[in-house]
């Protein structure tokens, strides 16, 4: 029985934007979100805090690291400071916290041990939070429709809630054609324990969040926490205190304004290169680079490598109809990863022709003067031509007969 390969560290079909951008989008569609300003330097963060201090003397502040990763609150910094969301009492404290965040790495459950570099923070006025909830809208493929998931256990990881208290989760299936009904949202608000005017306020805000989900081709809108806060005028209102929104990359052609928000400087350079070449790539922590056509075959390849004692350095799906140039770029990406010590190419040619793959491999190996062990398994359309191209190339390529053979040879190549 195969052992499962390590869990991937990111999605390959989504665009993710920062919290401050997500909140602006929510406000655009009529939702209430905690406002704040972004600072790229500690000095700017102090200036923002001073401006708030002048408007609301004696107010407190929240400094939030702007990184494309969840779990900030429970994360820690490379230099030891705890938390990517910190409370400050004065503008000078805001400066000191921002100085510990900007230019440093934040490590969370989602970033792995390497962490992620922070180059900006969001400075907000602190608010009095009376209650916290979790709410998300996402696609449920099993149900074939969008689903609202909510719980009164806000501020926690939803996975933790689902494990410890599954009965605390509320799921509301939504009609794709009509969207959420008032009856559905009123019931949800009451299930969350809201009363009086807060029920309708919750309904209005969830409707706004669904507009973001629907109109912007979102794959996920996650608010954690969604809070009941007390305003300076002692009014109790619903407010999005944090926001994470992801978008379907296939919608880029009609969501140009949103996709212009993409922060490539915060992404793995390999991810950016793969995206530009229309390749599906996710970096992992192993040392065997993989290039495969088809997500299912890619997962099977990673599992088989793991079964034979190896560890995949990536998930890389070149798709079912890759051109020679894409094959070449895929190999360049693998070769650029300093952790990769061996490469396994596993291609099953249906629409894709094995001779095209072989030509791309040969061109890339010669161009890069690749000196890593390279194991190639080809099967399918024009496989004989493909194998002949590789055999006659004179290159040091290790042929494999099947997936198991390829995985064993890739793992063995690390020992030579």
From Swiss-Prot:
It comes from the Eukaryota. GO terms for cellular component: hydrogenosome; mitochondrion; succinate-CoA ligase complex. Its EC number is 6.2.1.5. It catalyses: succinate + ATP + CoA = succinyl-CoA + ADP + phosphate. Its cofactor is Mg(2+). One of its GO terms (molecular function) is magnesium ion binding. Residues 1-14 form a transit peptide. The record marks 60, 128 as: Important for substrate specificity. One of its GO terms (biological process) is succinyl-CoA metabolic process. Substrate binds at residues 293, 350-352. Binds 1 Mg(2+) ion per subunit. The keyword tRNA processing does not apply. ATP binds at residues 64, 71-73, 132. HAMAP family: Succ_CoA_beta. Belongs to the succinate/malate CoA ligase beta subunit family. This is Succinate--CoA ligase [ADP-forming] subunit beta. It comes from Blastocystis sp. subtype 1 (strain ATCC 50177 / NandII).
């Amino acid at each position: 029985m195969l052992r499962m390969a390590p869990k991937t560290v990111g999605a390959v079909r989504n665009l993710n934007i920062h919290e401050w951008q997500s909140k602006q989008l929510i406000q655009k569609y009529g939702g209430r979100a905690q406002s704040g300003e972004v600072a790229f330097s500690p000095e700017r963060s102090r200036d923002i805090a001073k401006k708030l201090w002048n408007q609301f003397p004696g107010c407190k502040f929240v400094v939030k690291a702007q990184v494309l990763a969840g779990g900030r609150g429970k994360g820690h910094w490379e230099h030891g400071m705890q938390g990517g969301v910190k409370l400050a009492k004065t503008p000078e404290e805001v400066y000191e916290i921002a100085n510990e965040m900007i230019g440093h790495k934040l490590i969370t459950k989602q970033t792995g041990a390497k962490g992620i570099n922070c180059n900006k923070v969001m400075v907000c006025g602190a608010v009095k939070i009376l209650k916290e909830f979790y709410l998300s809208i996402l696609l449920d493929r099993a149900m074939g429709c969008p689903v609202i998931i909510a719980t009164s256990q806000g501020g926690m990881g939803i996975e933790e809630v689902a494990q410890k208290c599954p009965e605390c989760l509320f799921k509301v299936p939504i009609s794709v054609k009509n969207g959420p009904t008032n009856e559905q949202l009123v019931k949800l608000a009451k299930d969350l324990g809201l009363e009086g005017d807060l029920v309708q306020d919750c309904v209005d805000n969830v409707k706004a969040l669904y507009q973001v989900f629907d109109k912007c081709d979102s794959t996920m809108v996650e608010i954690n926490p969604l809070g009941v806060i007390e305003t300076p005028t002692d009014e109790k209102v619903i407010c999005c205190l944090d926001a994470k929104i992801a978008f379907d990359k296939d919608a880029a052609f009609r969501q140009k304004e949103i996709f212009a928000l993409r922060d490539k400087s915060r992404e793995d350079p390999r991810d950016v290169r793969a995206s530009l070449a229309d390749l599906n790539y996710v970096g992992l922590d192993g040392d065997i680079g993989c290039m495969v056509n088809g997500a299912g075959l890619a997962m099977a390849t990673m599992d088989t490598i793991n079964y034979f004692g190896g560890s995949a350095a990536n998930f890389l799906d070149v798709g079912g109809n890759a051109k020679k140039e894409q094959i070449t770029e895929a190999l360049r990406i693998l070769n650029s990863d300093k952790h990769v010590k061996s490469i396994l190419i596993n291609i099953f040619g249906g629409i894709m022709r094995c001779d095209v793959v072989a030509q791309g491999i040969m061109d890339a190996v010669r161009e890069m003067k690749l000196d890593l062990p390279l194991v190639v398994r080809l099967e399918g359309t024009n496989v004989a031509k493909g194998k002949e191209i590789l055999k006659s190339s004179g290159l040091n390529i290790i042929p494999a007969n099947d997936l198991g053979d390829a995985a064993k040879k890739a793992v063995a190549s690390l020992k030579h």
